Amino acid sequence: MVSIRLSFIFLFIMNITFSQEVNWISMDKAQELQKKVPKNIMMDVYTDWCGPCKLMDKNTFQNPDVANFLNENFYAVKFNAEGNSTLKHNGKVFSNPGYSSSNSGRNSTHNFTKYLGVYGYPTIVFFDDASNPIAPITGYLTPEQIEIYLNLFSDKKYLNIKSQEDFKVFIENFESKFKS
C-alpha cells in the first residue's frame, strides 16, 4: 500500500515538473500588471508562417526550466508581428491598418513591430519594469541560449554591460542551470 502511495506521489510530482507551461499574456495585460507588481517583460514576436518560431515554441518555451524561469521572473507576452490586435504603449496606440483577414499566409507588419525595430522572426524583445524596450534578440534560441538572456534581463545585470567585452565576460562567467 505504501509503495502504491509513493508511486502516485512520484507521478504527481513528475506531472507538475513536465507540464510546466509559460503563462502567456497580452502586452496590455503585462503593462497593467507592472503597475501592481513591477517585473520585466519578455515578448516573443512571431508570425504564423515562421518555421523557426514554431520550433522555438516546441523546443524552447516547452522546456520546464525555461517556462518556470519565465513565469517567476517576467511577464511573458506573445505578439503576432502581423496580427490585427490594437495595443497601447507609452501613450501611443499601435495597430495594423494594412491587415487583411483574407491573406492566408503573410500579412502586413503591425505598427508595434515596426516601432520595436523588429525585422526578422522569431525575435525576443525584453522590456524593463516600466515597459521601456531594452533589447531585441533575433533568431531561434535553444533553452541553453535563451537562459543567458533571461538571466541577464531578469534583473538589472544588463545595466553593467557597457561593451561587447563586458558581454563576453558575462557569457564566459555564466553557469547554465537549465536542462536540455
Task: Say what each PLM segment does.
Residues 1-21:
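Bacterial Sec-dependent N-terminal signal peptides
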Residues 20, 117, 128, 134-180:
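Non-globular targeting/processing and membrane-anchoring segments
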Residues 21-24, 63-104:
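Thiol-based oxidoreductase modules, predominantly thioredoxin-like and allied folds used
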Residues 23-41, 70:
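A short beta-strand-turn-helix
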Residues 37-51, 76:
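Short active-site neighborhood of thiol/selenol oxidoreductases, capturing the structured segment around
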Residues 40, 95-102, 110-125:
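Structural micro-motif
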Residues 48, 81-84, 130, 142:
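Solvent-exposed coil/turn segments that connect beta secondary-structure elements
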Residues 54-58, 127:
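Detector for the c-type heme attachment site
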